[in-house]
Swiss-Prot record:
Principal subcellular localisation of the protein: nucleus
Subunit structure: Component of the HBO1 complex composed at least of ING4 or ING5, KAT7/HBO1, MEAF6, and one of JADE1, JADE2 and JADE3. Interacts with NPHP4.
Position(s), cross-link Glycyl lysine isopeptide (Lys-Gly) (interchain with G-Cter in SUMO2): 114
Residue pairs linked by disulfide bridges in the UniProt entry: none
Protein name: Protein Jade-1
Lineage, broadest ranks: Eukaryota, Metazoa, Chordata, Craniata, Vertebrata
Length: 509
């Protein structure tokens, strides 16, 4: 189909009268429709012109030059016959309006505080301050009246000697450096001394199984805070960490009491609730108690399964009715004693591995322990459990092996205490003047003056440190947080118990 090329619609209207007539008729019909549909008699803003489409159409036989028409290869669509939409009143068309807008000034973006995070390992961003670095840079020692008076007298001597005066901040820095170096070096010496006194002691035994032997994969591990010794398997240590190791109670900073015996300290693990603690040895030797995960040796479970008769037993060694006691394994012998009391007195406590890989625990009272040891020494084998007579709970230990062991343990403890006291009395030997002077870039004479004053002040204060160590402050803060969490846990536990009680009462009604 050919389409004619027309310069403009006005020329078509002048040259072809029929086209203008068609447009006028169409416009009148459009105006008539619009006037009928509108309540107000006004001209429409636009109409559809069909004359433009008619003027463009040419028959294929029409003779034109090739540059006067375009050939459309696309098929013709019927909706194109509706015409072209054109405006009727050009005055009603909105005129474009433009104006120059003033340049907006960019506002400074302020990052919300909740998105600001400071990490100790990463340097702070530009414009922000690392709180930890700022706290470490602040001097923790403050001068008191005595320090100020001594500083004034010392500065007068410095003037006479021709030395520069010493300011308060420098004095605080030097005294803080003395305290920090003394604390670090003394702790290292204490750990070394206590390590030599325990790890290389031939009498040291595991706190759980009381065995002094270790093997590959089941080494004996010492707590760096309370110095208890345990096997890896006995305490559930899957992998020995490099460096220091702390038991569960020391790691949490708590000193709980055992639920089953009156002994304080030792290798303890928590129950399922986490609020009560039990010695691992007590959990192993009391038959009703179990351990949730044998690999980790925690939590302690089934404490509620202990019968009331066992809770009512009185220990024959400490004479206390506290916790749950065990009884002698000899038939017809009912002597009761705590597990930890039996270990402290050196009673015979055996672990037997049965044929079906079942572990049996045998415990013997003081009388039967002495009989069995005497018979084993003479080569007569083990004692006959069925024929052994009943012993009284008040029978004393016949061979004083337990007392001798207690004396040796007390002697070792007293030796350690003497070493520790000697280290505390000689605290000033753990500070090197040259190292402090080089670290702070101060003259050795000034540091020596402060060193002598620091020694006198600590001796007057019974060798106590002048500032609290950072580690102790962190431990105190951690302990406070632990106490808060513990109180919350107790609150939630009581709340749950109350809800369960209400639910039970509701069900009964």
């Amino acid at each position: 189909m050919k389409r004619g090329r027309l310069p403009s619609s006005s020329e078509d209207s002048d040259d072809n009268g029929s086209l203008s007539t068609t447009w006028s008729q169409n416009s009148r019909s459009q105006h008539r429709r619009s006037s009928c549909s509108r309540p107000e008699d006004r001209k429409p803003s636009e109409v559809f012109r069909t004359d433009l489409i008619t003027a463009m159409k040419l028959h294929d036989s029409y003779q034109l030059n090739p540059d006067e028409y375009y050939v459309l290869a696309d098929p013709w669509r019927q909706e194109w016959e509706k015409g072209v939409q054109v405006p009727v009143s050009p005055g009603t068309i909105p005129q474009p309006v433009a104006r120059v807008v003033s340049e907006e000034k960019s506002l400074m973006f302020i990052r919300p505080k909740k998105y600001i995070v400071s990490s100790g390992s990463e340097p702070p961003e530009l414009g922000y301050v690392d709180i930890r670095t700022l706290a470490d840079s602040v001097c923790r020692y403050d001068l008191n009246d005595m320090d100020a008076a001594w500083l004034e007298l010392t500065n007068e001597e410095f003037k006479e000697m021709g030395m520069p005066e010493l300011d308060e901040y420098t004095m605080e820095r030097v005294l803080e450096e003395f305290e920090q170096r003394c604390y670090d070096n003394m702790n290292h010496a204490i750990e070394t001394e206590e390590g030599l006194g325990i790890e290389y002691d031939e009498y040291v035994v595991c706190d759980v199984c009381q065995s002094p032997d270790g093997e590959d994969g089941n080494e004996m591990v010492f707590c760096d805070k309370c110095n208890i010794c345990v096997h890896q398997a006995c305490y559930g240590i899957l992998k020995v960490p490099e460096g220091s190791w702390l038991c569960r109670t020391c790691a949490l900073g708590v000193q709980p009491k055992c639920l089953l015996c009156p002994k304080k300290g030792g290798a303890m693990k928590p129950t399922r609730s986490g609020t009560k603690w039990v010695h691992v040895s007590c959990a192993l030797w009391i038959p009703e108690v179990s351990i949730g995960s044998p690999e980790k040796m925690e939590p302690i479970t089934k404490v509620s399964h202990i019968p009331s008769s066992r809770w009512a037993l009185v220990c024959s060694l400490c004479n206390e009715k506290f916790g749950a006691s065990i009884q002698c394994s000899v038939k017809n012998c009912r002597t009761a004693f705590h597990v930890t009391c039996a270990f402290d007195r050196g009673l015979e406590m055996k672990t037997i591995l049965a044929e079906n890989d079942e572990v049996k625990f045998k415990s013997y009272c003081p009388k039967h322990s002495s009989h069995r040891k005497a018979e084993e020494g003479l080569g007569e084998g083990t004692a006959q459990e069925n024929g052994a007579p009943e012993c009284s709970p008040r029978d004393p230990l016949e061979p004083f092996a337990g007392l001798e062991q207690n004396r040796e343990e007390a002697h070792r403890v007293s030796v350690r205490k003497q070493k520790l006291q000697q280290l505390e009395d000689e605290f000033y030997t753990f500070v090197n003047l040259l190292d402090v002077a080089r670290a702070l870039r101060l003259p050795e004479e000034v540091v020596d003056f402060l060193y002598q004053y620091w020694k006198l002040k600590r001796k007057v204060n019974f060798n106590k440190p002048l500032i609290t160590p950072k580690k102790d402050e962190e431990d105190n803060l951690a302990k406070r947080e632990q106490d808060v969490l513990f109180r919350r846990l107790q609150l939630f536990t009581h709340l749950r118990q109350d809800l369960e009680r209400v639910m039970t009462d509701t069900d009964t009604l």
